[in-house]
Amino acid sequence: MQIKNASNLCEYMFSNCSRTGICFYAIPSTVKVENGSPDGNGGFGIAYKSTSEDYGMLIVFSYGKAVYMKIKSITWDNWKKVKFIE
């Protein structure tokens, strides 16, 4: 799915994903940090929603050569930059 504009990137990705589904999104660089983007560079994202719809996870692969993760339990955590061992 292409995200054109989102006031809250996380809620947009999460709400448009079906239960126990995994959804893939293209995120343009027009989705800025103030709209929920982790770095404003665009990229692509993966969203997962639990059966109860209370829990989920978002992973964003940024065009800025970084990977970010955000988890929802009751509320959303902050974006965490994933560090890889090279």
Please report, for each region that a protein language model flagged, where it lies by residue.
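C-terminal interaction-tip segments
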Residues: 80-86
